[in-house]
Amino acid sequence: MDNNTLLFQDKGSGRFKDVKIHPNRIEVLKKGTFGGKHTEIVYLKDITGVNRIKGRDVFLRNRLLTACVFSLNSRSQAQEFVNALNMVM
């Protein structure tokens, strides 16, 4: 499987404008404080597991013992996000 293959995509909510899962990374397009946008990349080798799903937010554990939070469009999209993540890990 190519590293640019798209496994999951959601338009996100709040500051998160686009959430994508690829075979080796999670890409998030975030809206900045002053209206700008930037892409944040989290590599899957740094993710140790899913901490919890609360509503439409997904909390992931990483190696630094800090939480990565992703806000998706709906609770069902959050569950699909976790399922796609479990498929890759």
Question: For the regions a protein language model found, what residue spans apply to each?
Answer:
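Acidic, Ser/Thr- and proline-rich intrinsically disordered linker/docking segments
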Residues: 2-15, 27-30, 34-89
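Broad, structure-driven detector of short, well-ordered beta-strand segments within folded domains
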Residues: 17-23
